[in-house]
Amino acid sequence: MSKVCQVTGKRPTTGNNVSHANNKTKRRFLPNLHHHRFWVESEQRFVRLRVSSKGMRIIDRKGIDQVLSDLRARGEKV
């Protein structure tokens, strides 16, 4: 499964580990993703999303119904 937030679209980025001697090796910065069940009152069911912490805050602010309608408009199956 890909490490992408379904709400924000956040995905891993790349960068460097830098040692004390200033040696650089490649690394990945992974988003803070969680599988989370949200209760959708209008559909009387739970929806399981893979969301980042920022995505959860967006759902708290906008509401799960608005976020789900945005996801469905993008063509994601929810």
UniProtKB/Swiss-Prot annotation:
One of its GO terms (biological process) is translation. The keyword rRNA-binding does not apply. Residues 1-22 are annotated as: Disordered. One of its GO terms (cellular component) is cytosolic large ribosomal subunit. Pfam families: Ribosomal_L28 (PF00830). Keywords: Ribonucleoprotein, Ribosomal protein. GO terms for molecular function: structural constituent of ribosome. InterPro entries: Ribosomal_bL28, Ribosomal_bL28/bL31-like_sf, Ribosomal_bL28_bact-type, Ribosomal_bL28_sf. PANTHER family: 39S RIBOSOMAL PROTEIN L28, MITOCHONDRIAL, LARGE RIBOSOMAL SUBUNIT PROTEIN BL28M. Belongs to the bacterial ribosomal protein bL28 family. This is Large ribosomal subunit protein bL28. It comes from Alkalilimnicola ehrlichii (strain ATCC BAA-1101 / DSM 17681 / MLHE-1).
